[in-house]
Amino acid sequence: VADGEATYHQFYFPDTNVLVTRMLTEDGIVEVQDFMPLLRPKDEAHRQRLVRRVVCVRGRMPMRMGIAPRMDYGRAPHEARATAYGAEFAGPAGALALRTRVPLRVEGRDAHGEFTLSAGESAAFVLEDAREDTGGTSAAEVEELFLGTVAYWRGWLSRSGYAGRWRERVHRSVLTLKLLTHEPSGAVIAAPTLGLPERVGGERNWDYRYVWIRDAAFSLYALLRLGFTEEADAFTGWLTRLLRKACVSGEGGPLRALYTIDGEAVREEVVLDHWEGYRGSAPCRVGNGAKDQLQLDIFGELIDSVYLFNKYGKGISYEAWTDLCTLLDWLLDHWDQPDESIWETRAGRQRHTYSRLMCWVAVERMVRVARQRGLPGDLGRWMATRDTMYRQIIEEGWDEEAGTFTQRLRPGDCAEAEEAVGGDAVVDAALLLMPMVKFLSPTIRASSARWKRSAATSSRTASSSATTRGSRRTAWRAPRARSRSARSGGWRR
């Protein structure tokens, strides 16, 4: 808004991923609608377009706009020039075109414009690859894109099988998960952001724009339970291609914690000293240092998602099963190693209870699938190792004095004294997943007592501000490359 103070409200157009920002002033009301056009599944025509439509709802509104693109995170130069259709920004790293009917002026590497809208009028701005020219920016053309995109999202969401009391929240969550999918490959990224801090002004600003095996598996759980089997099938295809080229030799194992959407290795983590993240939070990072970590828990999350896909989706192929057996063979030889686990600590590997839990899940689910489908496997070895894992978790992961399962197995080195309860017993919220993965039952008397005590301890620890997540406060050493909690809602088997 060009003149005066404005009140802002932001929301999604109902049952869509069209973002609406409403600005209210004494002179009128204007809406800014941001969306990526999507008119049909696998819509190649609009894959790299971002549309911003400004609509005056009431009054007469003077507006200003500006665009300041930076190539290669501000490390590559570019030149801006005015064009008949708007402006173009070109350099060695690529070229962008801003198409609009609003007159623009170029100032250095940026472009600006002023315009006034009366009630019922609109202006559109379309940002896309300069090599593409996928349509005009007239009011009618952009209206067609808007209506088509709204229809697509509502049609997609109509496939949801959820009709409970939390419909609005569940559907908003699954719409977000859909935004994180890469349709050409089937990959599911963890988040579309970098430079978004855990705390405003803090240092923990990570690059999340990759496929974390763990997070993608959690997303798959949610999609399957809601009835979106096509997305689950596409991710399983991505995973199958990944396993086909996985190397099972070496201590690093056949799986990495994270990959690019193409299934390739993630770049080295680089600090962008010249840039700031959200609200001045610095430093910004590109790439992710967790790429070389050993995170044994991902085998459990991955195989559990395959188990659910086999149960609710199309079912896995024999070829995919043989790949999983190869994966499991490696895990059976390495499951008792220290690792960085779900919290991706950078202070050295530990014997994490959560990793043992998910290794148990991996073997237990393979046994289930083999029996249910009659698939071949070394069930004797699998079950013996599974039972060894179970005993270790119960005997070394439980602290009787603290009344809780602990983050690390005994004997272990716990330096985080201020985060400990009952001596060396550091509480880990990830272990609250135990009943969800069928390790313990909160209703069967033999195991419910431990579970209830552990849950109560976790609740007390969290409410007293001592973190239940992991080694966060002491010598942080960039302890975790992410802050997302496990998306565990809807875990039912």
What is the meaning of each model-derived region?
Residues 1-493:
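Acidic, mature catalytic/reactive cores of soluble proteins
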